[in-house]
Amino acid sequence: MSTEQGIKAEFYTDKPKTIICDLDGTILKHAHVFSDLDKHDPQLNPGVIEKLNHWDSLGHTIVLMTARKESAREMTERHLRSLGVMWDHLVMGVTSGKRVLINDKLELQDQDRAVAVNVITDIGFNNTDWDGIGL
């Protein structure tokens, strides 16, 4: 295979996706005060566990990220496991400000290789057209 063929295969072959998903307000009901996180049982938002399980069964990589402090990792992982949430990576300590994903594509006219989805806080995953974005 030539270098050019290898590059095209890398960019144009359908492969499992990397799904990067926020935690509070997206996966879990939003707890607005960090110090209250361990005082209440965490709650999943509607449709979340079904979609995460589906994506996992398709071989997608699931990266959860949160503005929670690194010091809350043990508690956060315990909560997620107790709810049956599966993930590949958990990134702690990102800001709660705007998140920007930067990715490349081979040619200007090619389809974008990154997609952003914004769900309404605490509404869950049932009202999103996942098929429309290839998920």
Enumerate the language-model features and the residues they cover.
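HAD-like aspartate-dependent phosphatase fold
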Residues: 1-135
